[in-house]
Amino acid sequence: MSRQLLPVLLLLLLRASCPWGQEQGARSPSEEPPEEEIPKEDGILVLSRHTLGLALREHPALLVEFYAPWCGHCQALAPEYSKAAAVLAAESMVVTLAKVDGPAQRELAEEFGVTEYPTLKFFRNGNRTHPEEYTGPRDAEGIAEWLRRRVGPSAMRLEDEAAAQALIGGRDLVVIGFFQDLQDEDVATFLALAQDALDMTFGLTDRPRLFQQFGLTKDTVVLFKKFDEGRADFPVDEELGLDLGDLSRFLVTHSMRLVTEFNSQTSAKIFAARILNHLLLFVNQTLAAHRELLAGFGEAAPRFRGQVLFVVVDVAADNEHVLQYFGLKAEAAPTLRLVNLETTKKYAPVDGGPVTAASITAFCHAVLNGQVKPYLLSQEIPPDWDQRPVKTLVGKNFEQVAFDETKNVFVKFYAPWCTHCKEMAPAWEALAEKYQDHEDIIIAELDATANELDAFAVHGFPTLKYFPAGPGRKVIEYKSTRDLETFSKFLDNGGVLPTEEPPEEPAAPFPEPPANSTMGSKEEL
């Protein structure tokens, strides 16, 4: 009898030793709960860590926005994102839009390396490990077009002249790839570029008759446009093949008008053009005499295509920020300025004569050949610049004061709008008062938005630099805590701090022209 009971007793002991709730069929704490039905808001799937897997299985093309409820950029994107979903649904496109609350779904945010909001990722065919980063615009049509070119063909297949002419006639910018073999790897390069060049429409053909009708004998990418020259050809190198970077630069350069007016609609494309030299003609377009200058400006432009971008700035429009950047008043128009975006150096005509095609051409050649010195912005020296504890420096007196070999000069480079600068202002004033009786120490400040220096450029605010007495034009950048005690310790130690001092405080970046990315600003975590 005891032998018969032994297996039963062993079974009871095993059950008793299991953790509570681990009976057969129970779920361990580490297991995922069963997948839920995925809710929707305004046509957008609302995902969690429990439903992402289901969404990936059910939707072969899935764009997911990682957002934060407090993020202003996310709030601005939300209505456009919903509109894009509605547009694509109306077209019966096989693509789905979804969103994830990043702070609430921290595991997902960490899994996909989300460090700023909004971040959008595109998943294909359920592949969870290698999503594509979204790099397109933030408006509804831009989002929709970015997705169309990924779930559908990025270029239209053209079989005859009627189809080609219909495509060319229907858009301002049309790019057609003429390839004798559509299986060639150059075609894959062409289609890859077509996915992201959303401001152009792309076509593709291998028809010999179309080669003949457009005067081509070998593989060529042709840009058709309804302005300027009307057409620009990019022959494919028979030995090296089609280079994505070279083709991209060609299309960006030749898709720009020879003369572009600066405004809110064109500014992003101007800065994304990858042409470093920009020649700006400042005119008042309400005046007939100024408008007459545009013809000569346009006449000079073709010979500098790809080297210099010709831009018209209307001083009668909302362009005060452009005038300020060049240190100009509206009354200075008509006038020319050239800026190199890489070095930020600015140039002005030396003679200041009339603006003609000849004078514009000569000015451009002189700058490109290094025959014109750049000019630096500077405010006028205030009469009382040295009367307060904090001395006021401008471009015109900076060198004389900062590199005085008999003085130790501590300078704050600031921007009037900078919050960090305003927060540290009381400490800087207190520092100046503390050391105002030290004849060999000067505490100063310089508005770096209105004054430029030949010695170095300022890239963030506030930037603090110490210029010790003595020869050699030595410069020490201060990167520690911005308070009176630490400032004083720094000065008393001759421009050095003990190693235990806390790390540097952040600086607000100097405003830059819009970058090539079309996603715009994001908010970091």
From Swiss-Prot:
Highly expressed in pancreas (at protein level). The record marks G72, H73, T419, H420 as: Contributes to redox potential value. The disulfide-linked homodimer exhibits an enhanced chaperone activity. GO terms for cellular component: endoplasmic reticulum; endoplasmic reticulum lumen. The keyword Disulfide bond applies. It catalyses: Catalyzes the rearrangement of -S-S- bonds in proteins. This is Protein disulfide-isomerase A2. It comes from Homo sapiens. The lineage of its organism: Eukaryota, Metazoa, Chordata, Craniata, Vertebrata.
